[in-house]
Amino acid sequence: MDFNINRLVLLDALTKVSRAVSLKSPLPILTGIKFDLLEDGLVLTASDSDISIQTTINEGIIINQTGSVVLSSKYILEIIRKIDGDTVHIQVVDGTLTRITSESSLFDLNGSKSFDFPRIDLNKNGKHFSMKSYDFKKIIEKTLFATSEQETRPVLTGVNFKVDQHQLVCIATDSYRLAQVSMPIEDDIQFNIVIPKKSLNQIIHIIEKDEMIDLYVSDRKVLFVIGQYLVLTRLIDGTYPNTSRLVEDQGSYTMSINSSALLGAISRASLLSDEQSNIVKLTMSPDENVLSSYSQEIGSVEENLTKAFYKGEPMTISFSAKYLADAIRSIGTETIQLSFTEKMRPFQITGLDVNDNIQVVLPVRTY
């Protein structure tokens, strides 16, 4: 294997592909990146068994001799990042010993034989649909934060993707809050899958420009085609809970308020709240709306929500300040609407007269 390549082109590809590498993998070979130098380009592959990423570089490269090797992800990435010059020369000089040279640097890096690297099926099989990459990225950013951090219910550690009747619905919940974003799609297909949070996190870092991405959904995996990148991820087994009642029950009491004003009030009210629970209380009536918090050790604070408009019977409700702030940022509109049913029932947060992004927060019992 012998080639010259633009350093920044290689660095960008290695940075993205290395997102699939786990340095704690029980298989030492999977702590590396596989280099396959073919006649028409360089193929880079990495995997941790749960997610695999592959890309092909065919620009900014001069191929001198084809071949393959597996190089440590940690070291090859740091070498290419810190080495000088615009062009890098990489050559396997003895067995798997790989020499990386630039204008003033020479590194000899021990590699591994490429046939020890597991074979990864990146064939484009399964149900197919396409969408704009920025739409996909937006959906993930508006739902991913609501996934569970607890492994006791693995299905809640991912995002539920449902497609039916030309509609994509993405749902995430940790049982204390819920995020649901929907959008129309052109493809006439049906599926209901759960994609791991980790995989989605890696995918949104690969998306850099607005282009069409293709998804191929199978029973146990889904393949993303993003430009020159192929991302294969396993799916989470299990049935995602039915959350339709939470988003259908809009509530008869509503409050509309400027998003920035409420975020500011939440930030100030949570200054004196308990650091662990971060609970605040919202007291509402048609005449006055107050956000407050209390800590026996620290003190108390009250915020008068002068820009809020409330319709309904007087009500007091307590909840996590962080959860509501996350929901408001996800909605992203200038004005939001909060919809309530009862004091201890989940309440909704939406944009005003918009229902393509529905956030739900569960109240808590407090002082």
Model features per residue range: what roles?
Residues 1-367:
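Structural preference for solvent-exposed beta-strand-turn elements
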